[in-house]
From Swiss-Prot:
InterPro entries assigned to the protein according to its UniProt record, in alphabetical order: Bacteriohemerythrin-like, Haemerythrin_Fe_BS, Hemerythrin, Hemerythrin-like, Hemerythrin-like_sf, Hemerythrin_metal-bd
Function: Oxygen-binding protein. May be involved in a storage mechanism or for delivery to oxygen-requiring enzymes. The oxygen-binding site contains two iron atoms.
UniProt name for this protein: Bacteriohemerythrin
Entry GO MF terms: iron ion binding; oxygen carrier activity
Lineage of source species: Bacteria, Bacillati, Bacillota, Clostridia, Eubacteriales
HAMAP family per UniProt: Hemerythrin (MF_00556)
Residues where Fe cation 2 binds: E63, H78, H82, H119, D124
Family indicated by similarity: Belongs to the hemerythrin family.
Record-linked Gene3D superfamilies: Hemerythrin-like
Assembly description: Monomer.
């Protein structure tokens, strides 16, 4: 389970709530990983990937609009970070899902959660400091 911590708070309610939603989506993957009742998790994995990509695109757009509104000087490089995340999610090799579904979920979650945590604590923190 991935727990939201106070250290992830930026103090901007809209963005903090969107970041929490990204954690909620990641937790769906964690719950699926721990669920032993599904023999075939393929469709559920795909649902999570699609939801993650769509919500991340929404959030990144919202965050970039906010950064533009405050005249954030590093907006372009911040956007590149967002773009690299979306490209990585798009590059998840869905052909590998059936080889070992739990391993696939774990690797996907490792990337997603690490990226989100590091991005919030390092890159996002820059625009509030």
């Amino acid at each position: 389970m991935f727990v939201w911590k106070d250290e992830f708070e930026l103090g901007i309610d809209k963005i903090d709530n969107e970041h929490r939603k990204l954690f909620e989506i990641a937790n769906k993957g964690y719950e699926l990983l721990k669920n032993e009742f599904y023999v075939d998790k393929y469709d559920k994995i795909m649902d999570i990937i699609v939801e993650l990509k769509e919500y991340a695109e929404f959030h990144f757009s919202e965050e970039e609009d906010y950064l533009a509104s405050i005249g954030y000087k590093k907006l372009f490089t911040h956007k590149l970070e967002h773009d690299s995340f979306i490209k990585k999610v798009e590059s998840f090799n869905i052909k590998e899902i059936d080889y070992d579904q739990d391993k696939y979920i774990q690797e996907m979650l490792d990337f997603v959660v690490t990226w989100i945590k590091e991005h919030i604590l390092e890159k996002d923190r820059e625009y509030i400091d």
